[in-house]
Amino acid sequence: MSITNEQILDAVAEMSVMQVVELIEAMEEKFGVTAAAAVVAGGAAAEAAEEQTEFDVILTAIGGNKVSVIKAVRGATGLGLKEAKGLVDSAPAALKEGVDKAEAEGLKAQLEEAGATVEIK
């Protein structure tokens, strides 16, 4: 006989706070996971947006001057001609991920000057 999710939820609902804490600790130990990471990520989503330190530079459109955009992508990323062309042709595509704000703004300005449309996330 298998226990349903509803039965598990009912059993947890009847527990005291201390019993739930002990259950969570036992589950963390048994399965090798931590529940704290999920709580922090879910509770601090609004704060994370304000305190963002790493940004992704996304090429959303190439505009009318594809050659200039390819040159700008090569200069910004260090990719070879074939790789840069492939990246530009696959727009929207991530150019760089996890860069600081100053670098992201610099890349955006450089690519927009070449005619591309760029988004920073």
From Swiss-Prot:
The keyword Ribosomal protein applies. InterPro entries: Ribosomal_bL12 (IPR000206), Ribosomal_bL12_C (IPR013823), Ribosomal_bL12_C/ClpS-like (IPR014719), Ribosomal_bL12_oligo (IPR008932), Ribosomal_bL12_oligo_N_sf (IPR036235). One of its GO terms (molecular function) is structural constituent of ribosome. Keywords: Ribonucleoprotein, Ribosomal protein. It comes from the Bacteria. One of its GO terms (biological process) is translation. GO terms for cellular component: cytosolic large ribosomal subunit. Belongs to the bacterial ribosomal protein bL12 family. Forms part of the ribosomal stalk which helps the ribosome interact with GTP-bound translation factors. Is thus essential for accurate translation. Homodimer. Part of the ribosomal stalk of the 50S ribosomal subunit. Forms a multimeric L10(L12)X complex, where L10 forms an elongated spine to which 2 to 4 L12 dimers bind in a sequential fashion. Binds GTP-bound translation factors. This is Large ribosomal subunit protein bL12. It comes from Aliivibrio salmonicida (strain LFI1238) (Vibrio salmonicida (strain LFI1238)). The gene is rplL.
